[in-house]
């Protein structure tokens, strides 16, 4: 690249200095009007990374790519009936309490089973529960809890059950076109900034509906309009697969079901990953089962025939005996869990960078190319002005 004339360099410096001064004056004026921290360079932010909280499931943490749910973000969990949506959300509640946080459950469906929640590890004595009379009331309660900054997790079960007051006060058969969608759109606009500011995780459980007259494509949709789809940083599609049979005397009895959780949207890691978990009836996600499977695939736990072994020590013949061993030896469970997470670069409560649209390896080269292009364009313009 040819060296710039001396006069051209002086003009460039003067031009750049004036722009920098104008920018600094504008930043000072914005901070004066709206307060310190209202605008800043991204590199000056104290928190450039997104903190995460474990979902309570190792397989789901891996599928999420970041090690859990991002704090200060909206999560949507949807799927067919009895697919395990509430179970997935309750595991998040139990995990939040385990980490010393406070969780709230907005039960719009009025269907929460305290005994089942306790079986999943939820401390029901500490859980904040609200069963609102209308959708507006439920969202207002959620908003006040989030604004307080004292709640770490808010679960709304479910969006479909958030019935607008006008619909409740009206008669059955009255038309209320778009009423719930407008309510959710307004709620998302109000809650979005507050959720991010307080670092609260907001989980919205949603149901499925079918579009009438769809001949091609997926006819499934979720109620409540499109606002939640846009504002959600993570969307999980939960689907029940095959039934799990028991062993011994229960070999003909269904004791659980294999459930597939697909990450259909993810703003902090690559999307479209899947997690397959075993949801045992009355117990929730089998943590020993998912750890045994993943650790075996990574060869952390060795499998020879029907025997499972760890560090040359046999831990059980058959998967059920190996699961039982892991459940009875929590120190071994935690040790293997840490090894698995380290393999995937996941640590509980870690911070992860925002996912960029381009490959990170190419970023420095692209940035240099952009800077060089801008400099050349500026120089060409200045040379033309001098010639004139």
Curated annotation (Swiss-Prot):
InterPro entries: AAA+_ATPase, DNA_recomb/repair_RecA, DNA_recomb/repair_RecA_CS, P-loop_NTPase, RecA-like_C, RecA-like_N, RecA_ATP-bd, RecA_C_sf. It is found in: Cytoplasm. Residues 347-372 are annotated as: Disordered. Signal peptide: none annotated. SUPFAM superfamilies: P-loop containing nucleoside triphosphate hydrolases, RecA protein, C-terminal domain. Residues 357-369 have a biased composition (Basic and acidic residues). One of its GO terms (molecular function) is ATP binding. GO terms for cellular component: cytosol. Keywords: ATP-binding, Cytoplasm, DNA damage, DNA recombination, DNA repair, DNA-binding, Nucleotide-binding, SOS response. ATP binds at residues 79-86. GO terms for biological process: DNA recombination; DNA repair; SOS response. Belongs to the RecA family. Can catalyze the hydrolysis of ATP in the presence of single-stranded DNA, the ATP-dependent uptake of single-stranded DNA by duplex DNA, and the ATP-dependent hybridization of homologous single-stranded DNAs. It interacts with LexA causing its activation and leading to its autocatalytic cleavage. This is Protein RecA. It comes from Streptococcus pneumoniae (strain CGSP14). The lineage of its organism: Bacteria, Bacillati, Bacillota, Bacilli, Lactobacillales.
